[in-house]
């Protein structure tokens, strides 16, 4: 690793530079960037300031590249930001977010709001790193997949920052809960059975529409995947298609359980970003 200065207008960002795999070129990494807007930082708690940070990895020597904003899993109660193994020509923004607290100090809305702020930061700043703001994708695993859908499907979220869901190039949730997340429910005092599906304003299924960015929902395969997870995601995609969405894919990774859905699903995220996802996986496509 070595220090690298990248001049962006009047600013100089000091990045950590590493060499990627052969033929892939070099990437520059900058870590722990605060992503909350200045007005939010004024009233932010110490915990929020600690968690609301992101890492950026970009290809060196090229411009106009696509970017994936990646949200980690962990049931909204654990986990930490990390990069995924995709083509080095695709930039990544790996973001932390606040985790649910039993005392109610952090709610499901707070988790989603943090994720939204990270995506809005990326839309506003990726051009400074050489990326194309029209090629910003959002993806995440499990709880991160849930956040991906909530940020990219509920128009009120990005609307707070002057953006629309269609300002995103695409959504690629991996094994995200399409109904209301079970821990969002539990931490709010809901004692109903975990697998009783609930659809309200905190459920991605409530926002199915034709007016969404391209979306691929990636899951493991029943019966190995988390109960109901693949089925509810297929319903989400099928509902979007029935409402007129023309670029919606559903992928069930053969024999993959919930954990293996990550390693099996990331290659599909890469294909999606590169525009190489097989049309045969698109629901509603003619066979």
Residue ranges of model-derived segments:
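N-terminal cap/lid segment of alpha/beta-hydrolase-fold proteins
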Residues: 25-61
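Mobile cap/lid helix-loop segments that gate and shape the active-site cleft of serine hydrolases
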Residues: 37-38, 173-207
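Short, proline-enriched alpha-helix->beta-strand connector loops that line the catalytic pocket
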Residues: 165-169, 209-215, 243-246
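Short substrate-entry loop that stabilizes the transition state in hydrolases
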Residues: 63-65, 71-104, 226
């Amino acid at each position: 690793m070595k220090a690298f200065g990248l001049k962006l207008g009047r600013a100089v960002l000091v990045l950590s530079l590493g060499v990627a795999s052969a033929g892939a070129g070099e990437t520059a990494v900058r870590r722990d960037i605060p992503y909350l807007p200045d007005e939010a930082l004024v009233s932010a708690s110490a915990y929020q300031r600690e968690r609301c940070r992101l890492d950026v990895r970009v290809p060196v020597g090229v411009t106009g590249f696509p970017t994936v904003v990646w949200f980690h899993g962990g049931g909204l109660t654990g986990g930490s930001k990390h990069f995924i193994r995709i083509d080095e020509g695709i930039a990544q923004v790996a973001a932390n977010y606040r985790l649910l607290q039993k005392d109610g100090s952090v709610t499901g809305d707070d988790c989603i709001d943090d994720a939204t702020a990270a995506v809005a930061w990326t839309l506003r700043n990726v051009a400074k790193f050489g990326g194309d703001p029209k090629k910003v994708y959002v993806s995440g695993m499990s709880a991160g997949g849930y956040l991906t859908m909530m940020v990219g499907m509920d128009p009120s979220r990005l609307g707070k920052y002057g953006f629309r869901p269609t300002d995103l190039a695409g959504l690629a949730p991996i094994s995200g809960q399409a109904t209301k997340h079970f821990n969002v429910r539990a931490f709010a005092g809901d004692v109903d059975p975990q697998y009783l599906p609930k659809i309200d304003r905190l459920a991605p299924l409530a926002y199915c529409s034709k007016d969404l960015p391209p979306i691929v929902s990636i899951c493991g395969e029943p019966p190995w995947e988390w109960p109901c997870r693949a089925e509810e995601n297929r319903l989400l995609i099928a509902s979007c298609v029935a409402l007129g969405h023309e670029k919606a894919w559903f992928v069930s990774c053969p024999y993959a359980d919930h954990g293996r859905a990550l390693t099996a699903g990331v290659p599909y995220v890469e294909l999606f970003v590169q525009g190489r996802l097989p049309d045969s996986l698109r629901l509603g496509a003619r066979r």
